[in-house]
């Protein structure tokens, strides 16, 4: 086990409101081991983080108890997949679930090597809503914990936010995404979380390419990718802003893969041109004062195998070695702007969540037809 670095794998995946439970093992294996060719020796990580958006229909996100079985099944499947890999190579199970947190249809799952690592019990879990009227339609879910290696006492804090920001193209929607990011960071981060030794912000951030779509674009060309990413990609342009750069204190490894959205369902490489192909799915991490860090990670889209074709998004994985903390306090390096919220926003959001949930349930069960039919029958009887 490397004593100087943490080995971490982070994957984000928008499931498109539909997670086929019957195929959960194939899906989870692809997300955990995106670079496993079945031949080379696979290096297992200290931590595995799986971030999901739209893992269930949006209305179903209003009922956490209903979603618990699905989340538990995904978590158990992930643990079993990891321990099967361990058994095949080392013959000894060593992975378990460190924690799970959810907000609506957004979920984050953290798995760790419990034979080599220890975690303090005070795991923080927080949520920040930024959907319409403060609902869970959009938002972020945080899990934050302190961890060290067995035999060591230098605890380091890891924090992960899995987010789903405002969708669609255009300046107004871009500005709403900026507000969503600020609101989530403001709601879930206090000074302790902001000082985390290791901090990741991941998910379907929904930032778009602003250039007009050209059907002849060659996304396999590195020159084309560089031109789009440097000149027309919203998040990159916002992060380079001179006056108020977005995501200050975070950085991102160089993107070398084609856009991850929007694909035609059940097709591996064909984009749905109702939307401009964009890099919506991203993984940012806290900036380090270690110049070689960028050379110690891989940042790729996960191949769209048959198991993943049910979504119009392509998952993204970041596998990195993180530098160990020196143990000395560090100043706040993440810019967190206090987002103004009214005293009633929480209550309005709760009411909105309930309305979304029950209205969605009524439509799904076709109850609205029964209500409409009963109303028409009542009016007919009154007339007669």
From Swiss-Prot:
Keyword hit for Transmembrane helix: no
GO cellular component terms, A-Z: endoplasmic reticulum; endoplasmic reticulum membrane; fungal-type vacuole membrane
Sample GO molecular function, one term: phosphatidylinositol-4,5-bisphosphate 5-phosphatase activity
CDD domains xref list: INPP5c
Database matches in InterPro entries: Endo/exonu/phosph_ase_sf, IP5, IPPc
Entry keyword annotation includes Transport: yes
Membrane topology: Peripheral membrane protein
Pfam family, one: Exo_endo_phos2
EC number(s) from the headed UniProt entry: 3.1.3.36
Biological process annotations from GO: phosphatidylinositol dephosphorylation; protein transport
Keyword annotations from UniProtKB, A to Z: Endoplasmic reticulum, Hydrolase, Membrane, Protein transport, Transport
Subcellular location field: Endoplasmic reticulum membrane
Alphabetized PANTHER family for the sequence: INOSITOL 5-PHOSPHATASE, LD06095P
Other notes: Present with 1200 molecules/cell in log phase SD medium.
Family the entry assigns: Belongs to the inositol 1,4,5-trisphosphate 5-phosphatase family.
Functional note: Regulates the phosphatidylinositol (4,5)-diphosphate levels on the cytoplasmic surface of the endoplasmic reticulum and thereby regulates secretion. Does not utilize phosphatidylinositol 3,5-bisphosphate (PtdIns(3,5)P2), nor phosphatidylinositol 3-phosphate (PtdIns(3)P) and phosphatidylinositol 4-phosphate (PtdIns(4)P).
This protein's name: Phosphatidylinositol 4,5-bisphosphate 5-phosphatase INP54
Lineage summary: Eukaryota, Fungi, Dikarya, Ascomycota, Saccharomycotina
């Amino acid at each position: 086990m490397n004593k100087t670095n943490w080995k971490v794998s982070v994957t984000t995946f928008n499931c498109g409101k539909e997670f086929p439970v019957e195929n959960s093992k194939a899906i989870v294996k692809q997300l955990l081991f995106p670079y496993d060719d079945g031949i080379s020796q696979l290096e297992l990580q200290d931590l595995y983080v799986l971030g999901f958006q739209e893992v269930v229909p949006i209305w179903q996100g209003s009922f956490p108890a209903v979603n618990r079985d699905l989340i538990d099944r995904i978590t158990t499947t992930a643990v079993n997949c990891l321990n099967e890999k361990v058994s095949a190579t080392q013959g000894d199970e060593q992975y378990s679930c460190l924690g799970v947190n959810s907000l609506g249809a957004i979920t984050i799952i953290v798995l760790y090597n419990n034979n080599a690592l220890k975690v303090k019990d005070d795991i923080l879990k927080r949520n920040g809503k930024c959907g319409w009227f403060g609902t869970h339609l959009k938002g972020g879910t945080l899990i934050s914990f302190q961890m060290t290696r067995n035999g060591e006492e230098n605890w380091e804090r890891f924090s992960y936010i899995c987010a789903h920001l405002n969708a669609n193209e255009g300046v107004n929607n871009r500005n709403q995404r900026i507000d969503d990011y600020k609101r989530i960071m403001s709601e879930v981060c206090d000074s302790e979380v902001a000082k985390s030794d290791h901090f990741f912000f991941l998910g379907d951030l929904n930032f778009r390419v602003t250039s007009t779509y050209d059907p002849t674009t060659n996304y396999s060309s590195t020159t084309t990718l560089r031109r789009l990413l440097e000149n027309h990609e919203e998040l990159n342009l916002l992060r380079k802003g001179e006056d108020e750069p977005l995501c200050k204190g975070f950085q991102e490894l160089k993107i070398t893969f084609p856009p991850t959205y929007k694909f035609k369902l059940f097709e591996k490489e064909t984009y749905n041109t109702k939307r401009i192909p964009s890099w919506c799915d991203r993984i940012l991490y806290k900036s380090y004062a270690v110049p070689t860090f960028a050379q110690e990670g891989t940042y790729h889209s996960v191949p769209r195998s048959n198991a993943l074709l049910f979504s119009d998004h392509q998952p993204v994985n970041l596998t990195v070695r993180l530098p160990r903390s020196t143990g000395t306090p560090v100043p706040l390096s993440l810019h967190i702007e206090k987002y103004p919220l009214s005293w009633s926003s929480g209550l309005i959001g709760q009411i909105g969540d309930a309305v979304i949930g029950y209205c969605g349930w009524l439509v799904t069960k076709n109850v609205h037809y029964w209500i409409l039919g009963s109303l028409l029958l009542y009016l007919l009887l009154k007339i007669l």
